C-alpha cells in the first residue's frame, strides 16, 4: 500500500533540459497525486518524452527538482527508478520474447531455493499477481505467443510486482481492441484503488475524459497548465496544446476524383485466413478509405497489392495493364508505395539520419555511371523531403529517432514520394500523432490527391475516414462488405457493414 502522508507521490518542478541549439524543456512541472490518473498531453515534440527521460535518468536534467515520496531523487537508470517504485509501460514493449511470461516478470531477481531458481515460487507469485489484476495468461508460455494487449498486461503486472507507486503509461491503447481497452481501464482503476498514481499519455481525447482525474499540458517544451479534468472540454484542451483555437480538425476538401487508374478484381491472398475475393476501383485524385474492426484484414489488402503478401487469385490493373507485383521492389517500379502501420519497427531506421531515411526506398536513382552515389542529388532530394513535407529538424544529419512522431511520418511519406508513385497506400498514417501534426498530414494527403495520385488510407479512427476520404470500403472478416460514399454515409452504417460477415 502506498504511503499516504504525502499530497503528491511525485513532484517534478522547474525541470529544464537543453540540447545543442534546442531548449527541449523550459521549467516544466508535473505533480502526481496518490489514487489518481494524471493525463500528460502535448503535441509531438512538446517535451513529454524528454521530461520522462529526465525522470528515468536517461537524460541528465540541467535544472529543477524531482521529489518522490518526499525525498529528493536523481535516478541514474530506469532499473533504479523501477526498484524505487516508478515504472513505465512503453508504447514499444520491451520483453524477451523467447523466455516465458514469468521469466520476464522476475528477470534479474529470481526467487531462489539454495543455489537454484525456485520455479514453483515464481509460478505461484506470478499467478497471485495475475489473479489480483484479473489477467488470464499462463505464466509458463513464451512471450512470443502473446498478443500485443497481453504483452501490455504483462508490463503492468511487472510494475505491480515491484510494488510501483507511480506507473507511467505511454500510448497504452494504440494497438488494442475496444474490449482490451476496457480491460486495461479496469486494471488502471485497480492500481488507483491501491493508492498508485498513474501518468497517462495519449492523444485519444475520449480516453482522457473517460479515465483521468487531472491533466498537465506541455507546449514547445514549456508547462502550460495543470487542472482537474472536470469542467474542461476537448476544444479547450486542444487550444491549450496548440496555442491557438483549432477551428477545423480537417482541411477543406478540394480534390476532384477523375478517371479510374487502379482496378483490383477478385483479389485473394494465398495464406488464409486473410482477404478473399476483394474487388474495387480507385480514381486519379481520389482518397479511398478502408474501415473495419480489428482483425478484419484491412492491412492484408495493401500488403497483397504491394507484393509482400502472396496472392492465390485475382488481378491488379494500373491504367488497364496487369501488375504482377511479386515483391515490394517490383511494386515500387510499377508505381506503388506503402507507408506501413508500425512506423517504428518497419518504417524508420531510428539510429540513422534523415538523409538515409529519406532516400532508402530509391537508392538506385543516386548511382553514378561508376557505381558511386551522387552526393549532390542525395542532398537536394533530402532537402526536398524536408521542405515539401514541412519536416521540423535541425539538419540532414539528425537521427530520425530523435524527431517527433509527426515529423518521422512526414519523412516516411516524403521517402515514398521520391519514388514517384501513382498509388500511395497509407496504413494508420496518424497513429500516435498529435492533433496539430495530424492536420498537417491531412493537408499533405489532400495536396497529393490534387496532383492526381490515387490514395488508399486504412484507419481505425472513424472521424478521420469521414473527414478526408471520398469513398470508404468497409472490411468484414477478410471480405469487402460494401463501398460507401463518404458524404452520404454515417458511422452507424459503417459499423453495420463491418459486422456483416462476423
UniProtKB/Swiss-Prot annotation:
Pfam families in the record: ABC_tran
Q: What EC number(s) has UniProt assigned to this enzyme?
A: 7.5.2.11
Principal localisation = membrane
| Keywords associated with the record | ATP-binding, Cell inner membrane, Cell membrane, Membrane, Nucleotide-binding, Repeat, Sugar transport, Translocase, Transport
Q: Which InterPro entries match?
A: AAA+_ATPase, ABC_carbohydrate_import_ATPase, ABC_transporter-like_ATP-bd, ABC_transporter-like_CS, P-loop_NTPase
Ranges for domain ABC transporter: 10-245, 255-502
Question: Which family does this protein fall into?
Answer: Belongs to the ABC transporter superfamily. Galactose/methyl galactoside importer (TC 3.A.1.2.3) family.
Question: What is this protein's function?
Answer: Part of the ABC transporter complex MglABC involved in galactose/methyl galactoside import. Responsible for energy coupling to the transport system.
Q: What is this protein called?
A: Galactose/methyl galactoside import ATP-binding protein MglA
Q: Which organism is it from?
A: Vibrio cholerae serotype O1 (strain ATCC 39315 / El Tor Inaba N16961)
